Amino acid sequence: MRPLNVQIRLGNLRHNYQILKEMHGGKLLAVVKADAYGHGAVRCAFALADLADGFAVATIDEGIRLRESGITHPIVLLEGVFEASEYEAVEQYSLWPAVGNQWQLEALLIRHWKKPVKVWLKMDSGMHRTGFFPHDYASAYAALKQSEYVDSIVKFSHFSCADEPESGMTEIQMEAFDLGTEGLEGEESLANSAAILNVPEARRDWGRAGLALYGISPFGGSDDRLKPVMRLSTRIFGERVLQPHSPIGYGATFYTSKSTRVGLIACGYADGYPRRAPSNSPVAVDGKLTRVIGRVSMDMMTIELDASQEGLGHEVELWGDTVNINTVAEAAGTIPYELMCNIKRAKFTYIE
C-alpha cells in the first residue's frame, strides 16, 4: 500500500478550541467549512461536540452533512444561500443563514417560515466582498427586525487584514462596524482566528475560529499556544547515490554539488503537495530536517539524505510537528489553507 498518511490529532483540536475559547471570552464557532480545512468535518465536529458553541460552514450541503451525521449544535452558513429555494433546507435542517445582500434579504422576508429563523446579518466594513455597506446596514436590520419570521439577528463582519496587524485595516473596519451598528441591539461577531489571538477589541459575543483551530498561526511561523492537528507523512521507497553535477527531476533544475544520497518518496502534486515548492523546501526524516531537491513530480519527490540519516522504508514528515506547514507554504508561494484543503490519495487516521 502506498505509504502516504495523514494523521489528524483530535486531542490537539480540542486543545486549540479550548485555548481560543478562553482567549475570546465569549461564544466560539468552530469553522469546519471545506471539510474542516481538509481535516474531515464530521470527525472534527464530533471531537468538539462537548466543547463547541456551534459550527460554521460555507454551503448548504456542508450544513446538511453535519446534521445528517447527528450534529445538533447551531450551524451558521457563512455565505448564506446561493438561491432562494435553499431557504427550504435552511428551515428543514435548522441552519442559521448569513444575509449579505439585498436578494438574500428579500427572499428570506417573503418566505412563509414555519418557525422563526436566526439570521446573521453581514456588514461590508471594508473587505468589499459581500455584506451591506455601513450606511445601508440599519435599514436591512430594521427589515429583519420587523419580520415575524425572524427570531433574532447577529450582527457580523469579516476582517481583511487581521493577520497583518501593521496595516491598520482592522481598526478601520471595527470603527466602520461600530458606527454602522450604533443603536442596533443584538449579538455581534467580528473576531476570526487572527483577531482572537491579537485584537482584544474585536472579541465580541461570538468568535469564529478557523485556521488557528487547526493549530496554525495566521501570522506565519508558529504559535506555542497552538498544537498542529494535521501531520502529513510518507516513506522512502527508493535510494541512490549521485555523483557531483548530476541533474535531478523534470527540467533538470537541480544539480548536485557533491556526491549526494537521494531518497525517493511517495508524494507528489497529484496528492496535494505544491508543485511550486522549490528545492530546499523542508522535510524531516525520522525527525531530522532535510530538504526537497529537484522538481515535485505528480506522484513522487526526491529529497537529500545526509550520511547519518536512515534511508529505505523510513518515515518522512512533509508537515506537522518538525516541519511547520507555514514554512512549506511560504516556500511554495501559497498559504497553509490551500495545502491542507488539497490533500488527497492519502490514508487518514484519526487519533483521539
UniProtKB/Swiss-Prot annotation:
CDD domains in the cross-refs: PLPDE_III_AR_proteobact
Top EC class, one word: isomerase
One Pfam family here: Ala_racemase_N
Enzyme Commission code(s) on record: 5.1.1.1
UniProt GO cellular component terms: cytosol
Needed cofactors: pyridoxal 5'-phosphate
The keyword ATP-binding is annotated on this UniProt entry: no
GO molecular function, one term: pyridoxal phosphate binding
Chain residues that bind substrate: 129, 298
Entry-annotated residues carrying N6-(pyridoxal phosphate)lysine: 33
GO terms under biological process: D-alanine biosynthetic process
Functional pathway: Amino-acid biosynthesis; D-alanine biosynthesis; D-alanine from L-alanine: step 1/1
Record-linked SMART domains: Ala_racemase_C (SM01005)
The entry's keywords: Isomerase, Pyridoxal phosphate
Coiled-coil portions: none
Keyword presence, Isomerase: yes
PROSITE patterns on file: ALANINE_RACEMASE (PS00395)
InterPro entries associated with the record: Ala_racemase (IPR000821), Ala_racemase/Decarboxylase_C (IPR009006), Ala_racemase_C (IPR011079), Ala_racemase_N (IPR001608), Ala_racemase_pyridoxalP-BS (IPR020622), PLP-binding_barrel (IPR029066)
Catalysed reaction equations from the record: L-alanine = D-alanine
Family to which this protein belongs: Belongs to the alanine racemase family.
Function: Catalyzes the interconversion of L-alanine and D-alanine. May also act on other amino acids.
NCBIfam families tied to this protein: alr
Name under which the protein is recorded: Alanine racemase
Gene field: alr
